[in-house]
Amino acid sequence: MQIFTTPQQLAAQCRAWHAAGDDIALVPTMGYYHAGHEDLMAHGRTLAKRLVVSLFVNPAQFGPGEDLAAYPRDAERDTAIAASHGADAIFMPEPGSMYEADHATWVEVPDLARGLCGQSRPTHFRGVCTVVLKLFMLSAADVAVFGQKDWQQQAIIKRMVRDLNLPVRIETRPTVREADGLALSSRNVYLSPEERAQAPQIRQALLHAQKLAQEGAGSATLLREAVLRRWAELLPLGRLDYLTIVHPESLEPLDEVVGPALMACAVRMGKARLIDNILLHS
């Protein structure tokens, strides 16, 4: 496995691979790998002759007061994990090589970024889109793999790809979970033992809402209230950021669940901000 630390190194190698007729799969990450990341890599390995993993804690997607400095890092371990999944290259740039001091160009998908996580993180998806577009261009990826846990992110990236006619296919992998249902996240390390014990109730309440919807409950308000009641009882350490029901592609809020519908949430527990989602109807 090759290790690249500059955009120029990555671009040169990927051009050479394409010239040799090799297609390229990209798995963009911020590191501190868990089984969810490993699933993305394993899937990416099946999609193309060459697998590129990017490991970059992107400062542009962190807002003021967020956990950029504290975000967990273990580059040596992550490099070994990427190699174990057959990555041909790992891209580990310094922020200064990705963003000049006077960087002024941003990519946005405002309609899809406005709600859900965008409500409390207004510049987050601008940073995500900008760095992902950079990675697409540098790697010349034919396919890129993202996770369903970050549903809004993958929906925004799919729209960016469509709107800009980018020659890359997006694949979304199901969320990987702990045995008790908690979605895997690098930020789970922030949880105290008490918070960790309650955190699976996020998923349990979403499953309850899915069951109600599939039994015929159609009011988004009533479904939301059912989740909030369970959380009030079983998730007392949680502080709600948002809980909403939207169309899975447009991310427009829904009043009635009569077709495709996604319930998505963010809950703060201590230092951690946990996100999850569930398709009520697909």
UniProtKB/Swiss-Prot annotation:
| Record-linked InterPro entries | Pantoate_ligase, Pantoate_ligase_C, Rossmann-like_a/b/a_fold
Could you name the active-site residues? H37 (proton donor)
Q: Where in the cell is it found?
A: Cytoplasm
The SS bond pairs are none
Q: Which GO terms describe its molecular function?
A: ATP binding; pantoate-beta-alanine ligase activity
Alphabetically sorted, this entry's keywords are:
ATP-binding, Cytoplasm, Ligase, Nucleotide-binding, Pantothenate biosynthesis
Q: Which reaction does it catalyse?
A: (R)-pantoate + beta-alanine + ATP = (R)-pantothenate + AMP + diphosphate + H(+)
Binding positions for (R)-pantoate per the UniProt entry? Q61, Q153
Q: Which residues bind beta-alanine?
A: Q61
E.C. number: 6.3.2.1
Enzyme class per UniProt? ligase
Q: Pathway it belongs to?
A: Cofactor biosynthesis; (R)-pantothenate biosynthesis; (R)-pantothenate from (R)-pantoate and beta-alanine: step 1/1
This protein's assembly is summarised as:
Homodimer.
State the similarity comment: Belongs to the pantothenate synthetase family.
What this chain does, per the record? Catalyzes the condensation of pantoate with beta-alanine in an ATP-dependent reaction via a pantoyl-adenylate intermediate.
The record's listing under NCBIfam families reads:
panC
Protein's name according to its UniProt entry: Pantothenate synthetase
Q: Which organism does this sequence originate in?
A: Desulfovibrio desulfuricans (strain ATCC 27774 / DSM 6949 / MB)
Q: What gene is behind this protein?
A: panC
